[in-house]
A protein has these predicted regions:
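Short coil-to-helix segment of the ABC ATPase nucleotide-binding domain corresponding to the Q-loop/switch region
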Residues: 102-110
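A short, proline-enriched helix->beta-strand linker immediately N-terminal to the Walker B motif
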Residues: 161-165
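Helix-to-loop junction immediately C-terminal to a conserved catalytic motif
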Residues: 56
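Conserved ABC transporter NBD signature motif
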Residues: 64-72
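Conserved ABC ATPase signature
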Residues: 142-146, 150-152
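Catalytic Walker B motif of ABC-type/P-loop ATPase nucleotide-binding domains
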Residues: 167-170
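The feature captures the beta-strand-to-loop junction immediately N-terminal to the Walker
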Residues: 41-43
């Protein structure tokens, strides 16, 4: 039986913009399963990034239920949500979220430091992930000196270092040419297959949807599934 990694039930979210209350998510209900890649797409301002941030515990919904790997995010305080992001769920923002003046090794080590992992375990895990990502020769490179493709791989390595159940990526190929975008898409497929990770990608590029198992479309804050869930696919 396929396990649910993320469960969203009747999720609503509004923001006050220019003195006006704007609803960006409306009654969103969905399941995302372990071992699948889900692509979320839709027009600009449709609520894609907001939904990703809610799953990551970076934003809270106005109402509705969000459960990630069995954890009800509504029941967690800010410290609990922060710990969740260092253990269960990893979020890669569109700008990669890397610390520019640190080395590749130092950036990848950050989640383990925040989670209080002891030094010997940190060193072993960072080395393992960098080798997996093909970055073993870049450990001492300063992130600001790397190419866009290399920076994205560092961001993914950092997201993987805590062996998350759920990996969230906001427009992961937006700053890449198509050749490097394909490499990133293939990398997400390898992560899915090797670790059984649920990978959720927000994208505006319909070509990237060729690499996902299931796609969800957001229109005016409403989520519409346009391919069958993994539980019923043949």
């Amino acid at each position: 039986m396929v396990e649910v990694a993320v469960f969203l039930k009747d999720v609503w979210k509004s923001y006050r913009i220019g003195g006006k209350l704007v609803t960006v998510l409306r009654a969103v209900t969905a399941r995302i399963y372990k071992g699948e890649i889900v692509g979320i797409h839709g027009p600009s301002g449709s609520g894609k990034t907001t939904l990703l941030r809610i799953i990551a515990g970076l934003d809270r919904p106005d109402r509705g239920e969000v459960i990630v790997d069995g954890y009800n995010l509504n029941m967690l305080d800010e410290l609990g949500l922060a710990m969740l992001r260092n253990t269960v769920v990893s979020y890669i923002p569109q700008d990669y979220g890397l610390i520019e003046n640190l080395t590749v090794w130092e950036n990848v080590e950050v989640p383990l430091l925040l989670a209080g992992v002891e030094k010997s375990v940190r060193e072993s895990r960072v080395k393992e992930v960098l080798e997996y990502m093909g970055l073993a020769d870049k450990v001492n490179a300063i992130v600001s000196k790397l190419s866009g493709g290399e920076r994205q791989r560092v961001a993914i390595a950092r997201a993987l270092v805590n062996t998350p159940t759920v990996l969230l990526a906001d427009e992961p190929t937006a700053n890449l040419d198509w050749e490097n975008a394909i490499k990133v898409a293939e990398l997400f497929k390898r992560i899915r297959d090797d670790f059984g990770t649920a990978v959720v990608i927000v994208t505006h590029d319909p070509r990237l949807l060729e690499f996902v198992d299931r796609s969800l479309n957001i229109v005016d804050g409403t989520l519409k599934e346009i391919s069958p869930p993994i539980s019923i696919r043949k």
